[in-house]
């Protein structure tokens, strides 16, 4: 950890991501020497009235917001917290992904975003495959929240079969969020998921999610 604080801004996809930043990521990042700010991506800027926030509908809108944020010289590093599943198909790198592992594909897209924005302060991060991936990593913790259910066993089986939480696939019926909804109708994305992830903690997430661990390692190298 460094003694001088630098500002890290995290542009997040929605409310659930913001909650996880507040409760899990921010305390860790502050300890690493960052002053953390965050914002939810703007989806609509009307001529009058408040802007709408949450969700990523197109690369053009996201690119404009990233560049708007980078106008601030106060930001040392700008990073993102968006799902790889459902990321806009018009985004750089999405249409020429390599036919290899999910790790290679997401890294290809992130590198393409970096190249397009062309600002050394920009460190894009896409969650493999979505925020609920981290809830899969916290399967045992979710099991404690839903004691008496077989939720933990179902999630752990999926993780074992896939080879890790980040490899639970991203099909429209089999993505982590779809599986959670099917396994547990009362599961709350904005409450239960963040609680379980916080209980698992940063080190638990890093141990199970290599792409997440690589992202934090890159941020740590910049403090």
Segments (PLM) and residue ranges:
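Non-catalytic terminal and connector segments of soluble metabolic enzymes
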Residues: 52-59
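Catalytic nucleophile-elbow at a beta strand-turn-alpha helix junction centered on a G-D-S/GDSL motif
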Residues: 10-19
């Amino acid at each position: 950890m460094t003694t001088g604080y630098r500002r890290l801004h995290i542009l997040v996809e929605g409310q659930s991501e913001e909650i996880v930043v507040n409760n899990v990521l921010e305390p860790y990042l502050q300890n690493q020497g960052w002053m953390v700010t965050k914002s939810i991506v703007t989806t609509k800027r009307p001529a009058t009235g408040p802007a709408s926030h949450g969700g990523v509908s197109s690369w053009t809108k996201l690119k404009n917001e990233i560049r708007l944020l980078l106008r601030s010289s106060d930001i040392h590093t700008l990073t993102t917290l968006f799902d790889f599943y459902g990321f806009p198909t018009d985004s750089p790198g999405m249409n020429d992904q390599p036919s290899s592992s999910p790790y290679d594909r997401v890294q290809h897209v992130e590198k393409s975003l970096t190249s397009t924005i062309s600002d050394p302060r920009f460190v894009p991060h896409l969650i493999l495959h979505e925020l609920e991936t981290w809830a899969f990593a916290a399967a045992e913790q979710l099991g404690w929240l839903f004691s008496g259910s077989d939720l933990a066993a179902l999630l752990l089986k999926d993780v074992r079969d896939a080879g890790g939480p980040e490899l639970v696939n991203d099909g429209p019926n089999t993505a982590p969020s779809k599986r959670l909804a099917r396994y547990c109708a009362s599961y709350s994305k904005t409450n239960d998921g963040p609680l379980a992830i916080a209980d698992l903690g940063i080190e638990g997430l890093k141990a199970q999610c290599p792409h997440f661990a690589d992202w934090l390692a890159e941020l740590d190298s910049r403090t």
